[in-house]
Structure formats: structure tokens, C-alpha cells
Amino acid sequence: MLRAAARFGPRLGRRLLSAAATQAVPAPNQQPEVFCNQIFINNEWHDAVSRKTFPTVNPSTGEVICQVAEGDKEDVDKAVKAARAAFQLGSPWRRMDASHRGRLLNRLADLIERDRTYLAALETLDNGKPYVISYLVDLDMVLKCLRYYAGWADKYHGKTIPIDGDFFSYTRHEPVGVCGQIIPWNFPLLMQAWKLGPALATGNVVVMKVAEQTPLTALYVANLIKEAGFPPGVVNIVPGFGPTAGAAIASHEDVDKVAFTGSTEIGRVIQVAAGSSNLKRVTLELGGKSPNIIMSDADMDWAVEQAHFALFFNQGQCCCAGSRTFVQEDIYDEFVERSVARAKSRVVGNPFDSKTEQGPQVDETQFKKILGYINTGKQEGAKLLCGGGIAADRGYFIQPTVFGDVQDGMTIAKEEIFGPVMQILKFKTIEEVVGRANNSTYGLAAAVFTKDLDKANYLSQALQAGTVWVNCYDVFGAQSPFGGYKMSGSGRELGEYGLQAYTEVKTVTVKVPQKNS
């Protein structure tokens, strides 16, 4: 995912992870100490009201890292109460200059950069992604996101409006209020930054639920939020499970907005809960089955490497992964042969090893789910060209897997696998591939590889997706919005568009004695 990763292009694989490319990456502590494993409310650490805990597991070994406080409805209630108090008129947060909010976000980014090596190691320990990627990609994008929104803090404002009559009219961009934020496990630090940046820049307060699979880095950042100087109650972080803590946020009558990144199935549940409670506004960034279209005139070397990257990056655990690779028939055989060779050469192993390209899946549940999809693919007639099995005797490692001769009606071509399983489909004409690509309930992203500008423009307009990449994949920047069509979600994150979901527009009209132009 992400711009920093894509910038390396074909070097992102073996070449990015070579010794030469990693000279600037400090050596990790493979057993980083865990400092924060409780609930963060009002700038203080708390045990769960129930005193319950849950284990967070190292996916490379299957061993428990530590126990974490298990937040539930009562803990969410406490967090919402603290956030609401911090948002009261006259509070330090409400009276703070917008420019000072920006300085606090910049200070938070500085503290994250100070602790970058530790956070990258902790992310790798808890999530399983290669340490080099945690350090060079995820942390890099976290810093850029927070600093980008720090710059917006005093620049997203209303306007004066010349209405008829002796009146003066203007708009204010006001914070929504208490924002519930539920983040996923595939990019824990980055998704935290995507949510916190626009919310805090616009003056909101936050109650965040972190994924139970990967709570540790987000909780450590809570310590840095306090150190940066954010007032108590502005950010509250509750580790816990979706059906309990997550559901409590989505249905809470005193939460004004909820933002969720995760599966379409859970997104539906959250939208229903929001509507049946207080009609809180909702933004959803959900699943995808993104088409990656390789035209016959594409640069073959680049297309093969980018298609590999589009699917296998982050162990295939990307909502926008290029998981339907459509290849024009006259280059299909060569593309498949070269894609299989590239997958076979992919280095799977210890995520702290600088040579590793692919670590484990995040947990046993995902591990078994992906293996189940592989079996389904074989049973339904897709041709297994490489991989398909377990890649280590412990941990949740899966071999890089490629299926050929995939048909649109097969389960693996319709459902989000969220793992290192590439599906390659053949097409004849550009008109055909547009129809097939759009024949999906999802619409998060798409890509096209071609040297023909007319084809690129036609496809970028015809494809039903929130993001279309041309001759690249997973190029992200904090400046560009991201979000989906159809069942891939609603609303946008990042960029100026990402601020809209966190503000209310108020119109103020004043009677004046006499208007002069």
C-alpha cells in the first residue's frame, strides 16, 4: 500500500529489501518492551471496568505477547463522557486557537518520529509485517499524514456570502463533536493517523477502538498524545472486541459521528446501529475486489512487478489489493509464466529479517480463512500454478499463491480473500473487460497498465472505483482522497475531502442597517 512503497517500484521486493536499500534502517529490537496495555481515558491509564483482559499474539510464532485490558460498553461510556467534557463550550480544547491545534499535531508527529524505531518494531511484533516496511512505509506515511493535517488546522474555514437585502451572511466550519473511530489490524498505526489527523485538525474529540489483533502501537501513541500536550479527554483509546466495544461506540447516543475501516459485513452492522440510535453520521472504508487490467501494449516487466506488488504487499492484507488481475489474451501466457516465477521467488520468513518480503498473516482466523479460499479455488476449477500451502511449521505463514484460468463466477474471483492469493483472468477486448471489472459489489480501487493514453483515459472514466491508478498501483499521498463506490463504503479519507466528514457547516445571517458593496 501507500505512496512510499510504490515509489520504489520494482525495487520494493527483493531489491528494496537488499542490504544496500536498508542501510538507513536502524536495526530492530526483535522483542520490544510493551509499555502500554490498558485503556486510555482522560490522559490516564485504566484497567477495564470488568477487570477482564485478552491476549495479543505474535503471528510469527503464535505465542502471546502480553495481556491487554478488554474494554466493553462501560469503558466506552467512560470514554465518551470524558470526550464530551473535553468538548464543552469554554473548555481548553474549544478555546484553543486552530493554529495551536496544528502545532500539537506537528508535535505528535515529532514524537512519533523520535520513537520511530521502537514503533516499527512493535508494529512488526504485533502485526507480522516486515520491519523494513513498518519503518520505511507505514511510519513514513503516518508522519506525512499528521503533518499534512496539522497544516490544515487553521486553513479550513467558511466564507462570506453576498445574499440579497440588508444582511451579512457567512458560514462557519464547526467540529462535529464526539467522533467514534474504529480502526483495523492491517495498518494499525497508519489507520490511526488517517482517523486522528482530520478529526483533531478540525477541533473534534475522539473515542477510538483499536483492533483486538493489533492494539499495542496505537496504545503507545496514546502516551505520545499526552506528551504532546493534548488536553485530557480529547483522545481516548479503548482496546476491545467489535461486538462489545465497537458496537457500543456505533450505537452510543452521545457519539456524533463514527468512522470505520474494515469489512463490508461489519460496515453494514455499524451503519444500521448508527441509524437506529441517534442518526450519527457515518464514514465507511470497507472491502474491495479491485480489478487490475493489463493491456497487451503494457510494459511487461513493469506490469508483472506491479501486479505482484498490488496483490502481495502487506501479505495480501490490503482492502484495495489488485485481487482480480485481468490480462489481455495475446500476452496472457507470458504474463502468467512470469508472475508465477516472481511469486515463487518471493521471500517468506521472519519479518525482522531485512531480506523478508512477506511475513505471517495477522492471526489464526485469517490464516485458516485464506487456506479455505485456496481449497475452494481448486475445487471450483481454477488452476493452482504455485503455492497454496503453509509456509512454516509455526506461525501463520502462507505460501505466495497464484491461480490461473480463473472465471468470473468463481468464489475466489468474487469474494475478498485478504491474503497472498493472486487470481489471473483472461480477457479479449477493452469493452469486455470494463463490463467484467464493474460486475462486482465492490468499487474501492482499480488500475490499468497501457502505453496508450486513449485507453488509459477511457478506462479511468469507465471503471466504477473511488481510485484508479494508471501504470502504477497503491500510490497514496495524504493529499489525495481515498474511498469507495458501492459496497466498498461511503465518504472519503485523506486530502481536503477528508475534512468534510469532521465538520458541520453553519450559516450565520446578520441584519445590518445598510449594506454597501
UniProtKB/Swiss-Prot annotation:
NAD(+) binds at G262, S263, T264, E265, I266, G267. Pfam families: Aldedh (PF00171). The keyword Mitochondrion applies. PROSITE patterns: ALDEHYDE_DEHYDR_CYS, ALDEHYDE_DEHYDR_GLU. Keywords: Acetylation, Disease variant, Dwarfism, Intellectual disability, Mitochondrion, NAD, Oxidoreductase, Transit peptide, Ubl conjugation. Changing E496K: In allele ALDH2*3. This is Aldehyde dehydrogenase, mitochondrial. It comes from Homo sapiens.
